Amino acid sequence: MGKEQFRARTGCLTCRDRHIKCDEALPRCKNCCKSNRQCERGIRLNFIETQTSNAQPQAELPPGTKLKFHDESQAIASGYAVGAQEVKLVQISNTEPKPQTELPQAGASKDGSIPQAKTVSSTEQTTLVSAQRSPLPALRLITDHDESLLMEIFLGKVAPWMDCLVANKPFTNTAPFCALRHPALYNAIMACGEKYLMPTEESLYYGKACQGLQLETAKPNTDHGLCVATSTLLNAYETMGDGVNECRSDRTRALMGKANLDGGSSDSLVRDSKLSCDTDRMKAALNVDHGAEVAQGTYNDSPQRLSQDCEQYKGWCDEWASNVPRSMMPLCYIPPPDQDASSATATHFPQVMFVGSSSTVARLLYHVSCLLLARIQAAERSAESQEAQSRQTRHAMDICGIASQGEDKYETLSLDEQTHELLLHSSSPFRGTGTLITIFPETETLATWLSAVFPLLFGILTNLKSRKKHFKFWIELLKTHLGGRASFNPKSV
């Protein structure tokens, strides 16, 4: 009888692939040495499907059935020597992470001032930033510096180009606030702002916007206006690049076609915004004239009557802040940095962004009124002076934060060098404290500062001819208050 043949069980994988017998030499077999091949070692797993002929047809499950999957691959691999040493069991959590569907939120403060929100990054967009004792609904705000810059670029550079043929300017007045509730539209706006800054770079926001638009079109109750706005912005993003990418353009058109959208649906973007409260009450809420008279010491009533009037004026201001429409509330709010910030370009003021000059002017008038009332209460009521002092600081910081964001803030100034330096936030006592309290030591100084600020506000109003009637009330009040001290012409508004 011949010699019994045996099959190698620990041979190399290279000889097995070549279908030749391996001598099982270590660390390299002779066959691999002769042919100058790599001698591969290890265990190869072959999964063989069994009982394929007797497989039963898949049962149809009713909609909504919960399925649970068991991963048995690690249990199989653990039966081998190598698998038992290398494979580690991983516990998989059954809880799914919540998607990022909302932007940072901040609540309005009790006195209506802009909340001191915390700065969050784009990866922390679900963080809720609420002010204490807030009786008002939470507001969605952009609190990330980079995203605030992209939004500012979109409003200043991209949106005017897209609204050049539409009188109501939907991409300037409507889209930014809708984007705070819809991540797809928000990412599309961020992508356009980033493309304007870096035309040759691909934006991560573009991919997120396309993905969000695809999910939106798959919903049974698709918001056609949202899809049209997002698709239009994505097309604008593609147009701003070096060359129009046909593949991406086809994908955008396919998404629009899937949602049964056409050009006529864009009418849903044009809406006439209406104020959500009585216009006369909103105007009366910021009665700057009486506040200025009291601050200058020309109020002749008794201290008790003065206190009652201050409470009434403060109630008007709070009511205005509570009922003002969302379009007149801040779109972005970035708190000031820490006092020990080492950056040379660090500012002591918050960065506040509004959409439209009317919102900016209205909020500035509101903060000036609250600042005057807080100063009066601090002087009349010693027991509440600390709380009033805190309100003065908060409103003063917001005034400087809003005024420092305007592009045309210096075009209408015709002031002496000292007042101009004051408005540039560069006076020496102001740098040391970061507040406006130290520059108001006397009533005369306060009146001088107001005389410098109000012409600045009227300069912003020069572009609001279509909304002249909304500010006629303020023009008359400020004209009476300022008299001949300020160089402005209300008829030019």
Curated annotation (Swiss-Prot):
Compartments reported by the entry: Membrane; Nucleus
Q: Which residues cross the membrane?
A: 445-464
Give the superkingdom in one word: Eukaryota
Q: Where is the signal peptide?
A: none
Going by the UniProt record, its keywords in alphabetical order are: DNA-binding, Membrane, Metal-binding, Nucleus, Transcription, Transcription regulation, Transmembrane, Transmembrane helix, Zinc
GO-annotated molecular function: DNA-binding transcription factor activity, RNA polymerase II-specific; transcription cis-regulatory region binding; zinc ion binding
The primary location reported for this protein is: membrane
Q: Which GO terms describe its biological process?
A: positive regulation of transcription by RNA polymerase II
Q: Membrane topology per the record? A: Single-pass membrane protein
Q: Record keywords: Transcription regulation included?
A: yes
Biased composition of type Polar residues is found at 116-129
* Presence of keyword Chloroplast: no
Q: Which residues bind DNA?
A: 12-39
> InterPro entries recorded for this chain?
Zn2-C6_fun-type_DNA-bd_sf, Zn2Cys6_DnaBD
| UniProt-listed SMART domains | GAL4
Q: Where is this region: Disordered?
A: 94-129
Gene Ontology cellular component? membrane; nucleus
Q: Which PROSITE patterns match?
A: ZN2_CY6_FUNGAL_1, ZN2_CY6_FUNGAL_2
Q: Which Pfam families match?
A: Zn_clus
Q: Which PANTHER family match?
A: TRANSCRIPTIONAL ACTIVATOR PROTEIN UGA3, ZN(2)-C6 FUNGAL-TYPE DOMAIN-CONTAINING PROTEIN
What the protein does comes down to: Transcription factor; part of the gene cluster that mediates the biosynthesis of the meroterpenoids arthripenoids.
Q: What is this protein identified as?
A: Transcription factor atnE
Question: Native species of this protein?
Answer: Arthrinium sp
